[in-house]
Amino acid sequence: EPSSTPAEKITINIAAQKGPTGLGMVKLMQDSEDGSTANTYNVTIASSPDAAVSMISSGEADVAALPTNTAAILYNKTSGNVQLAALNTLGVLYVVTNGEEVNSIEDLRGKTVYSSGQGATPEYAVNYILSENGMEPGTDVTIEYKADHSELAASILSGDAKIAVLPEPFVTQVTTKDPNVKVALNLTDEWDKVAGDKSVLTMGCLAVRKDFVEQNKEAFDA
């Protein structure tokens, strides 16, 4: 007969990141501190997707907020021991400008666009949208990559970057700090225009260690 006793409270170690993939953790962190969650959540803010990957691969983290493509690669590398648990971040990418007029994807032709997230979802999303609009990334549009979202935000504010692909919450930060920085394009809308019903632009997901879930299924489901 199933027990009605609640699952024992355990500590779940989570690797999150600055930017959209970690943004959804803020309320969880607060609720955990207040003691109002089913489990105790120990959230570490990793400096990059690679750092979060390292934490979940080594067992330092049980759960990691990762770019969706990174989670897919990790699933294959670990022979399925790191699995996708949930999608937690849909499209939050925007083209922002500082002193450039951009009203459509076509307006990016011949321009230099700055981005972060090389090798992650932003790169694949931008390349797909450009290609589907008849432009070859690197040929028709020059793309320069910054190390992280914070560096890119600083570049658009200083005017070093005139056009940038930036995620929330950094978009709100830069447009609030400088009214000359404008949101030119919503890349979720641009993705939908070319992909139709075939796919949805997802940015981030929660990946979990399979062995952790198997050992703590009740607590994880909570």
Predicted regions and their residues:
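Pocket-lining segment of extracytoplasmic ligand-binding domains
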Residues: 69-70, 144, 150-222
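Short, glycine-/small- and polar/acidic-enriched structural segments
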Residues: 3-146, 155-158, 162-168, 178-186
